[in-house]
Structure formats: structure tokens, C-alpha cells
Amino acid sequence: MRVALLSESPADEAALRLLVEAVLVESFAMVKPGLRARGWPNVAQVLPAILRHLHFNTDADGLVIVVDSDDSVVHTAEHEAPDYFHPQCRLCQLRGIFRRTQKKFPPLHGRDRVLRAVGIAVPAIEAWYLCGQDPQVTELAWMEGQARAQAPYTRRDLKWRVYGTDRPGLGFEIQRAMECARRHRDPRRLAADFPHGFGAMARDLRGWRPRDAARK
């Protein structure tokens, strides 16, 4: 399988590769996305160009994107209703960009389009890294805090818990990201504690398999 990854930093993408392999239960060949993104909203800004590059210039099977939710609206089951779109939900926004960009692409390289997998780390990818180690860090805890206007922790808190600092050097950040991601060879705990953000990505990825098998 040939897959491109897009996230907010090289450290995020290093961890994302391991998490995607855990969901797919197989390794994959990396395809360069053509452009890099650094933070939100840059991911959304470069996504159309990346989709065009992957469709016309590569034989990539799919593109996986993960961004932090920060303080935005968290994706929920209600957002999965047909034709539903929440303008403040980053997962809804990214899916919308996929639809608008790809709808006029002709079939190419043996596929109709590059497959989509989108995840949202609530409120930041460091929360995923702490899954199974800190039971207080969950998607539900964050959403309940949003409802009370009293966050149970901050993104800075999460960085301190993972890195021992809120300003890790890139090399150390990548090292810790990969160490944490390797703990999730079985991703079911992540899907249970982060059912909307991680769960959405996992469901997308599991839906890739039939087409990939047909191409072999």
C-alpha cells in the first residue's frame, strides 16, 4: 500500500506513521505529499494542492491527515449524519476540502481518487501519546470541560507531561512521539478514549482495505 501523511510537524508525522500501521496491521510505502504544512490553518491551505499532486503525479492509494483540535468544536457522532457540516469542526472542514477538490478529478493510475483518512487529536496529539498512562486525559474529559468553560488541562500541560518541557527540541520531540506511538500497537484503547478524533481516522483506514486488495 502506498500512503502519504500530512500533519502539523515532523514529530506528529513520525508518530502518525506508526499509528496508521497499527490500525492497518501492516506496513506501507511512504509517498511524499509534495508540500509540507506547519500548524493549522496551513494544513487546510495546502491540502488542495497536495491532493492534486498525489492524484496526478503519484500512484498513492491514500492520504492520512491528523491535526490538533485546539479550542475548536470537537467532532461528534452528530457530524456523521449525511450532508451534515459544522463550520467550526476541523474534521468536517478537511473532509469538505477533500470532496470539493476531488469531485472533478478523472480516474488515473488505476483509481478513481486518492483515499481519505482524517483524524483530529483532541485537544492536541500529546493527548494521544498519554493514552493508557493518564486516565484523566480523554476526549470526553475535554468535551465536558468545554461545556463547563473550564478545561481539565491545557495543551501546555500535555506537553510538560510528555516531554518534561513545553518547548522540546525537534529531535527529542520526534523521539518521544515515536516512543509513545509504539505503545499503541493495539490501537483499541486509543479508539475507546478518543472515539471521535482517533476513531474517525481508524474507521476511514479500515474502509481502505477492500480496494487495496482489489488492486493487488
Please place each PLM-identified region on the residue numbering.
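Conserved helicase motor
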Residues: 35-40
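Helix N-cap/beta->alpha junction signal
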Residues: 8-9
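Structural motif
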Residues: 41-48
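C-terminal accessory helical subdomains adjacent to catalytic cores in phosphodiester-
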Residues: 2, 13-34, 48-216
